[in-house]
């Protein structure tokens, strides 16, 4: 059976090579060719013996998911639509800044968590992405951005904040994270990789044990009553449990703070009283807040909080000593802003709000 080498992290690739009677250093060579150099053709791996190249051609492929479209925003943001098969596509976003280049990666085709303010959840859920489909987004973005030639690192940061809940696809997300960290692959620092979660408490503990990277928690409400409505997973893992999990994660995290993501919804969660409730909620967790202006999508009942309200809300948090930033909306002209990623999902598990765009239309 032919295997896709993009599905292997360093450890599993070494094990597969051993099964083929090859030494560990050969696996490292191939890993460097695939991920550092972005090479998919075994014949182009010139420092590998011809006999091994022939063996690889017979037993393996390097098959990243295809890029269906590549849209460039007026602000330099790029959104890639990635074909993951069976009529499904996911979205990957590159956000350039003066001091960094951040790639936002998807981990699922759709999302089952159905957060009230997020268009991905309204598309429904199909399936988890494979390791190749997750790391393949980074592989393809490096090619599109010209980052596979020369020493300059175009993508300096990766965030698992695209479509889906990374911790609901734990095994494949962690394998992809390990490739990002591997010096023979992408060589990123743990501090420069962020996993975003809506609060799957037991799996947060697993991440801390197995692959601690920077953590962002989609908080969005200061109390259980409101969060139950906005982030339904809260009904299973309420805020008291979530805050305790954040404290445990900090014992293993590469950064000494948790980032709390907080979407600003006009008249819903943006009052002074909400800000004061937040201060009481997070008093035992060393944290930063990232306030996110709501990005509208068809069928949503919410409105973006006025800019002055967002500034005042941030001031309350900062006056209490909490570092608080307001995310600059990027890529909204190409629907690449936070909460707008919808891709194309053939939903088999629950109803879908709005129309799902077939890939044949997306390509046109």
Swiss-Prot record:
Disulfide bonds join 104-338. It catalyses: adenosine(2503) in 23S rRNA + 2 reduced [2Fe-2S]-[ferredoxin] + 2 S-adenosyl-L-methionine = 2-methyladenosine(2503) in 23S rRNA + 5'-deoxyadenosine + L-methionine + 2 oxidized [2Fe-2S]-[ferredoxin] + S-adenosyl-L-homocysteine; adenosine(37) in tRNA + 2 reduced [2Fe-2S]-[ferredoxin] + 2 S-adenosyl-L-methionine = 2-methyladenosine(37) in tRNA + 5'-deoxyadenosine + L-methionine + 2 oxidized [2Fe-2S]-[ferredoxin] + S-adenosyl-L-homocysteine. Its main location: cytoplasm. GO terms for biological process: rRNA base methylation; tRNA methylation. This is Dual-specificity RNA methyltransferase RlmN. Its EC number is 2.1.1.192. [4Fe-4S] cluster binds at residues 111, 115, 118. NCBIfam families: rRNA_mod_RlmN (TIGR00048). The keyword tRNA processing applies. GO terms for cellular component: cytoplasm. S-adenosyl-L-methionine binds at residues 164-165, 196, 218-220, 295. Binds 1 [4Fe-4S] cluster. The cluster is coordinated with 3 cysteines and an exchangeable S-adenosyl-L-methionine. Reaction proceeds by a ping-pong mechanism involving intermediate methylation of a conserved cysteine residue. The gene is rlmN. Its cofactor is [4Fe-4S] cluster. It comes from Dechloromonas aromatica (strain RCB). CDD domains: Radical_SAM. Keywords: 4Fe-4S, Cytoplasm, Disulfide bond, Iron, Iron-sulfur, Metal-binding, Methyltransferase, rRNA processing, S-adenosyl-L-methionine, Transferase, tRNA processing. InterPro entries: Aldolase_TIM (IPR013785), Elp3/MiaA/NifB-like_rSAM (IPR006638), Methyltransferase_A (IPR040072), RlmN_N (IPR048641), RNA_MTrfase_RlmN (IPR027492), rRNA_lsu_MTrfase_RlmN/Cfr (IPR004383), rSAM (IPR007197). Pfam families: Radical_SAM, RlmN_N. PANTHER family: 23S RRNA METHYLTRANSFERASE, RADICAL SAM CORE DOMAIN-CONTAINING PROTEIN. Specifically methylates position 2 of adenine 2503 in 23S rRNA and position 2 of adenine 37 in tRNAs. m2A2503 modification seems to play a crucial role in the proofreading step occurring at the peptidyl transferase center and thus would serve to optimize ribosomal fidelity. Belongs to the radical SAM superfamily. RlmN family. Signal peptide: none annotated.
């Amino acid at each position: 059976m032919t295997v896709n080498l993009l599905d292997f992290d360093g450890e599993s690739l070494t094990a597969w090579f051993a099964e083929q009677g090859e030494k560990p250093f050969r696996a490292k060579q191939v890993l460097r060719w695939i991920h550092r150099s972005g090479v998919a053709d075994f014949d182009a791996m010139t420092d590998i013996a011809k006999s091994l190249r022939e063996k690889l051609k017979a037993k393996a492929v390097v098959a990243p998911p295809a890029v269906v479209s590549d849209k460039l925003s007026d602000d330099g943001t790029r959104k890639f639509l990635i074909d993951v098969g069976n009529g499904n596509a996911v979205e990957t976003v590159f956000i350039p800044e003066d001091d960094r280049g951040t790639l936002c990666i998807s981990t699922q085709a759709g999302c089952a968590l159905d957060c009230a303010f997020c268009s991905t959840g309204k598309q429904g859920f199909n399936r988890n992405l494979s390791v190749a489909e997750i790391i393949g987004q980074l592989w393809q973005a490096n090619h599109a951005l010209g980052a596979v030639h020369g020493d300059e690192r175009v993508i300096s940061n990766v965030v698992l904040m695209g479509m889906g809940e990374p911790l609901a696809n734990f095994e494949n997300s962690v394998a992809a994270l390990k490739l990002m960290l591997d010096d023979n692959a992408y060589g990123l620092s743990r501090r420069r990789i962020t996993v975003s979660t809506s609060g799957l408490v037991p799996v947060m503990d697993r991440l801390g044990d197995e692959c601690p990277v920077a953590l962002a928690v989609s908080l969005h409400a200061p109390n259980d009553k409101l969060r139950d409505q906005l982030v339904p997973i809260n009904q299973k893992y309420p805020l008291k449990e979530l805050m305790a999990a954040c404290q445990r994660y900090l014992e293993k995290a590469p950064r000494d703070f948790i980032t709390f993501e907080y979407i600003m919804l006009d008249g819903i969660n943006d009052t002074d009283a909400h800000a004061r409730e937040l201060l009481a909620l997070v008093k035992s967790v060393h944290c930063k807040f990232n306030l996110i202006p709501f990005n509208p999508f068809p069928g949503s009942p919410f409105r973006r909080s006025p800019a002055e309200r967002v500034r005042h809300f941030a001031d309350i948090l900062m006056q209490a000593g909490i570092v608080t930033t307001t995310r600059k909306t990027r890529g909204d002209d190409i629907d690449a802003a936070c909460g707008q990623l919808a891709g194309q999902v053939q939903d088999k598990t629950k109803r879908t709000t709005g129309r799902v765009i077939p890939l044949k239309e997306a390509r046109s």
